[in-house]
Amino acid sequence: MKHEMVFTFLLMMVRPEASTSRIPRRRTTFTVEQLYLLEMYFAQSQYVGCDERERLARILSLDEYQVKIWFQNRRIRMRREANK
């Protein structure tokens, strides 16, 4: 057991990326209801503040990070469509 810990420590010293290896996060699939509400909020305001993001996440049973990224991606999609 002790040898395994020493080996792991030495491996992390030599190859730092070995300590950060992790399973990639699965892509979020939004429900129709979640998308509807997110689009409604986006139509009102393209930017959502911290408090509103927290509230939206709670209502939709999502992480704040997921709501934040959804708004970022939606703004990018809107700009891309406007440039066509």
Curated annotation (Swiss-Prot):
Keywords: Developmental protein, DNA-binding, Homeobox, Nucleus. SMART domains: HOX (SM00389). CDD domains: homeodomain (cd00086). PROSITE patterns: HOMEOBOX_1, HOMEOBOX_2. GO terms for biological process: cell differentiation; regulation of transcription by RNA polymerase II. It comes from the Eukaryota. GO terms for molecular function: DNA-binding transcription factor activity, RNA polymerase II-specific; RNA polymerase II cis-regulatory region sequence-specific DNA binding. Residues 23-82 bind DNA. This is Homeobox protein ceh-7.
